[in-house]
Each structure stands twice: as C-alpha cells, then as structure tokens.
C-alpha cells in the first residue's frame, strides 16, 4: 500500500456481531442460571390456625420457611376458613407472587385438617388436581393430589401426592399410597410423581422391618430421598425420620439436585422452645434442576473463553 494513504479498519459484518452476542449470551445464561433449582417442600405446621400465625415470632419464622420454597405442601392446617392461608400470603406477597390450593377439611372425627399448597405463581401453575376417592376408608386424611408445571423442557410437569398418616395405621396407609400412585399415573399419564409429607414412618409408629416391607420399598422405581436416620423432629429428645419424600420417574431422577430436611431452629437461631411454637417437625425438601445434569460451571467458563477467542 502506498505510504501516506489512510488505513481504514475492516468493518465487521452485523451478522457476525449478532452471532457473537448470541453465543456469549447463551453461555452466560447457562453459567449463571445453570445452578438455579426449583424447590418443593413439605411441612407439618402443627395445628396451624389464624390465632397461631398472628403471633409475630411465629409468623416471621413461617414466612421465612415458606419463602424458600417454590411449592410448599402444608399439613395440619386446621382452620375451617381460608383466613390463615390468606394472612400468610399477604405477608409473602411483598416481594414475590404467590397463590394457593387447598383440600377440604379431612378426618374421621371432630378433629379435621387440610392440605394446602402454597406456590410461586410466577414460576409454576396448577394443571390438575383432585381428592383421592378413598372408597374403603383406608386413609384418615386421603391425599389431595395436584399436578404442577415445572420450568424444565426435560420435565414440563410433576405430580405431587401429599399424605399425613395417622400413627396407628401407618403401614396400612403407606401401602395404600401405592394405589394412589397407580391411580394418578394412569389418570394423567404421568409417572413423574413425588409422594411427600409426614408419613410417621419411623420409631414407634413403624419398625424398620415393617418399613422395608412396604410396597413403596419393594416395588421398582421408587426412591426415598430423605434417608433413614435423618431426624425430622425439633425436640432434642426425639430422633425420628417421620417426614419423607419419595420420588418416582426418570424425569424426576434426571433433575434431582438435592434432598434434605431444613433445620429452621438452627438457621434462624431459635431455642427449642421458640421453634416448638412454630412446629415440632422440620420441613423436608427436594431441589430439581431446571435442566439435566450436564456441563459443570467450570467447563462452561472455559467454553465461553474459547468461543470468544474463536469469534474474536
């Protein structure tokens, strides 16, 4: 090139710039959002009434517990009206969108309770629900089954089957829970089912030998993700795995990230006495990835750098 002539930089095509931006954006989404999980919880809230939740210390703790979960299944809600749940939703709504779905009051005596789903309505929606038709009256509180959407292409929906057993009939009710699974999986053609709640499946209510003979233990495909021996009770004097989560279906297994109890007294620095005002149970929870376990974050970082160098 003759000296003295101006040198103009080569113009990068718009399509090239757009492609580079798309690659970077896609990888950043995977890198930042890949670890985001969807949390499903179950909590025996121990005779939950409006009188109980309007106590400030109880309400604050309950709201913090509920706010951790994308779907929470509450048990032992004994309020015949909707006031208790509406009060909790009012406190939750300050930062996020929530809705709820509840069963009727259930029970054989004057004592009755209901199942209540509280869920993030900006992240999931109810597709279907029904009260299991317990024609033989096996359950004291028959499951209130619901199907929810999930933010996952691998598993677009999941079925939740909550159960709070009565201690004297634990084995009978848990074996009948297998029939509920068959009913719902055939009804909605969906075998990705999570059974969860206060099963009373330990200690004096169910000996280990009887536990291992349950249909949900002997039939293939069921995974008890809260391990035996995990204490789900608040009192220091007890050590029982009453509360459980049982998962079925390949989609659930592919997306499973973690399952655990939530020790809310330790997290919120409560004494045992303070915690017992909320409940004598810990919540149990399962986390589902939005995509199947794939590229680890450190590999995504490397892939991002390589892509930038190739496009640069």
Curated annotation (Swiss-Prot):
Signal peptide, first to last residue? 1-35
Superkingdom of the source species: Eukaryota
Q: What class of enzyme is it?
A: hydrolase
* SUPFAM superfamilies in the record: DNase I-like
The family database entries (Pfam families) matched by this protein are listed as: Exo_endo_phos
By sequence similarity, the record places it as follows: Belongs to the DNase I family.
Protein name in the entry? Deoxyribonuclease-1-like 1
Q: Which organism is it from?
A: Rattus norvegicus (Rat)
User: What is the primary gene name for this protein?
Assistant: Dnase1l1
């Amino acid at each position: 090139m003759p000296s003295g002539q101006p040198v103009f930089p080569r113009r990068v095509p718009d399509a090239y710039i757009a492609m580079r931006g798309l690659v970077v954006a896609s990888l950043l989404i995977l890198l930042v959002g890949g670890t985001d999980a969807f949390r499903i919880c179950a909590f025996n809230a121990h005779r939950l009434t409006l009188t109980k939740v309007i106590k400030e210390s109880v309400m604050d703790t309950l709201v913090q517990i509920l706010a951790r979960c994308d779907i929470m299944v509450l048990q032992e809600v004994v309020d015949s009206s909707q006031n208790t749940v509406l009060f909790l939703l009012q406190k939750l709504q300050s930062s996020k969108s929530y809705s709820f779905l509840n069963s009727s009051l259930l029970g054989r005596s004057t004592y009755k309770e209901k199942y209540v789903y509280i869920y993030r309505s900006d992240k999931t929606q109810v597709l279907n629900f029904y009260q299991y038709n317990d024609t033989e009256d096996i359950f004291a509180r028959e499951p209130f089954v619901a199907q929810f959407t999930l933010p996952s292409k691998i598993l677009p929906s999941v079925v939740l089957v909550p159960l709070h057993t009565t201690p004297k009939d634990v084995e009978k009710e848990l074996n009948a829970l297998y029939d509920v699974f068959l009913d719902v999986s055939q009804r909605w053609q969906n075998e990705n089912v999570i059974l969860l709640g206060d099963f009373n499946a330990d200690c004096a209510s169910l000996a280990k030998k009887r536990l291992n003979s349950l249909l949900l233990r002997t039939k293939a495909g069921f995974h008890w993700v809260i391990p035996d021996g995990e204490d789900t009770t608040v009192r220091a004097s007890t050590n029982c795995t009453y509360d459980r989560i049982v998962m079925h279906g390949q989609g659930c297994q592919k997306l499973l990230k973690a399952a655990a109890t939530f020790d809310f007294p330790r997290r919120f620095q409560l004494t045992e006495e303070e915690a017992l005002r909320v409940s004598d149970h810990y919540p149990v929870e399962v986390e589902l990835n939005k995509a199947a376990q794939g590229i680890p974050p450190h590999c995504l970082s490397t892939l991002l750098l390589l892509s930038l160098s190739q496009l640069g």
